[in-house]
Amino acid sequence: MLERTLRVLEYNKVKEQLLEHTASSLGRDKVKHLVPSTDFEEIVEMQDTTDEAAKVIRLKGSAPLGGITDIRSNVKRAKIGSMLSPNELLDIANTMYGSRNMKRFIEDMADNGVELPILETHVAQIVSLYDLEKKITNCIGDGGEVVDSASDKLRGIRTQIRTAESRIREKLENMTRSSNAQKMLSDSIVTIRNERYVIPVKQEYRGVYGGIVHDQSASGQTLFIEPQVIVELNNALQEARVKEKQEIERILLMLTEEVAVEADIVLSNVEVVANLDFIFAKAFYAKRIKATKPIVNNERYMDLRQARHPLIDPEIIVPNNIMLGKDFTTIVITGPNTGGKTVTLKTVGICVLMAQSGLHIPVMDESEICVFKNIFADIGDEQSIEQSLSTFSSHMVNIVDILEKADFESLVLFDELGAGTDPQEGAALAISILDEVCNRGARVVATTHYPELKAYGYNREQVINASVEFDVNTLSPTYKLLIGVPGRSNAFEISKRLGLSDRVIEQARNHISTDTNKIENMIAKLEESQKNAERDWNEAEALRKQSEKLHRELQRQIIEFNEDRDERLLKAQKEGEEKVEAAKKEAEGIIQELRQLRKAQLANVKDHELIEAKSRLEGAAPELVKKQKVNVKNTAPKQQLRAGDEVKVLTFGQKGQLLEKVSDTEWSVQIGILKMKVKESNMEYINTPKQTEKKAVATVKGRDYHVSLELDLRGERFENAMARVEKYLDDAQLASYPRVSIIHGKGTGALRQGVQDYLKKHRGVKTFRYGDMGEGGLGVTVVELK
């Protein structure tokens, strides 16, 4: 494909927009090297592939391409024996995870009945390297640091380092806190110079501490001295750090060697995910410009329905129907300048280039396009200053080149053919050039403002005239392409609308020939007839589509109703049974807990209450629900409830005491040792006489209440985790724990954020923080309870 054609049709601007939808540098590299194909089979496959990716986006909204980076150079370095850095190894692990995740994503969709044969073929080439991926992530943290657990030796060395640092700091801090030190030190701090711990000593007291001077302040008044008493400790610390560095290098070399062993597979996987990134970028771009998959034919004709230029705002562009190659092989668009002829010409060219690049094009469904071996375009004023060529000469140089190369597999686009010279000679040249290209079997779209070419379409069987509609009322083009209607100047109508007198206009009409007037009148009537015919056709087509859509919708609804009816009934029954079973299990757990507490003599619970509660749950679920509804209706509290009131909780048949109102319809109720939320409609007020001494609510304190000091939420779903946090905090408060730990892991951070958002609202939480280095760091939240 000629570079000049790609430039004048703004193909690279389309590629720039396509680049915005890539997820990695791998995909961007593919886009930068994208050129139109001329192979029919390849183009069909590319269109089908883009269509499958577009289907994925319609169903899922996106594709999991995050975390993928260009690791090819790193893998090649590993292959020749270079040691990779922690971040380079982490990039490799993340890319391996991304490729594995993408493979699983496509295969899961296919397993669920989504037809994606081409994408399945792509992901089938991805080889999972899970073991290598885990080895890297087990040794290297998210921040690119080699973690303590990378090896037992590294863990031991870092323990030594922390111990040595602690001893050094302790000694130095004791020195800085002494009363004598205040006058000798510039500041009571411990700092580091040249990787050794030092203290800032005033110049005049340098001999007091002995040791080694490592640095001085800009003024020279302060010396950073390593006191003699910690020199040996600092030496031991440095030795440990050297060992740490050596062990880290050993681990990195080991991991690099593992990568080198699998280098060919890793590189192959990278190529697959690069192609997938490229494919999905095409699909996302299609969604952005509202493009569809064209039918690609091998019969040298195109039928672009409601075609739009992809670089023009779809809100302002006027779509057009453009057909070429069946009933006619050449379209000559005539009419005045600034009427949108060039936009129409470029729309044809860019749609063909996009389609042959595997991109969907901005047209309606069922549009067709063919494959051209060559696309030639002579558009715009590109005269060469160096060659001192005029506008006409510049165009003619390009046209000569086109005439030498154009054949029956070519698409030729001429903009203002014959312009830039004497109108009569220019029109004659334009006709001859069109005849030459048409005789070679090429498909041609040409624009011109020469009136002589209006008759050209009527004298040649394979040529048709066209024009861009002009609205005389608004004095502006509508940009609507009218196939079969030649353009006219509209000069008389425009002048009349602008106020020129009828007398002057009539005199002007007398100056042109009768034949010309007849032709203009004929064109006007033809234009009006075409408008009416097109309007009627559009109305009929709209009604047909509406009827077909309604028919399809009714059929779909009937099928769905018949298919889903039994399934929904079964699902509802199953869900009901699951809820009842879950309620039974929960009640069993409560009963078991109460019995254990009774054995520990921490609560006063009667056997007949346990048996009665269990017997109610053992009954049929519909009966239980029915009884509860009746009870709720008959026993809804009529009295204004207050904190401290005694109530009967109908679900359990137990008495409780109101603690506080948590919402318009719910109270926090203490039932024995348990505290729970209960709706007002599910409780019955008990009228008890006031006593001079309040009866204490049963509480549980001390170590005998077996609640763990930490709650592990790793692997839990978000909703389940929040429910466990709520119950755990209640239990911990009952056990009088001052501090507990909640383990949520690092992960994506969603669970961690959810836990901390909940802690902010919990009344029993005094404060909370992340765990320290020995407590689990960012993977743990330590909670101080009130």
From Swiss-Prot:
Listed EC numbers: 3.1.-.-, 3.6.4.-
SUPFAM superfamilies for this protein: DNA repair protein MutS, domain III, P-loop containing nucleoside triphosphate hydrolases, SMR domain-like
Annotated Smr domain residues: 711-786
Family of the protein in this entry: Belongs to the DNA mismatch repair MutS family. MutS2 subfamily.
InterPro entries: DNA_mismatch_repair_MutS_C, DNA_mismatch_repair_MutS_core, DNA_mismatch_repair_MutS_sf, MSSS, MutS, MutS2, P-loop_NTPase, Smr_dom
Gene, per the UniProt record: mutS2
Residues bound to ATP: 335-342
Protein name: Endonuclease MutS2
SMART domains documented for this protein: MUTSac, MUTSd, SMR
Transmembrane feature ranges: none
Keyword annotations of the record: ATP-binding, DNA-binding, Endonuclease, Hydrolase, Nuclease, Nucleotide-binding, RNA-binding, rRNA-binding
Disulfide bonds: none
Short name of one Pfam family: MSSS
Physiological role: Endonuclease that is involved in the suppression of homologous recombination and thus may have a key role in the control of bacterial genetic diversity. Acts as a ribosome collision sensor, splitting the ribosome into its 2 subunits. Detects stalled/collided 70S ribosomes which it binds and splits by an ATP-hydrolysis driven conformational change. Acts upstream of the ribosome quality control system (RQC), a ribosome-associated complex that mediates the extraction of incompletely synthesized nascent chains from stalled ribosomes and their subsequent degradation. Probably generates substrates for RQC.
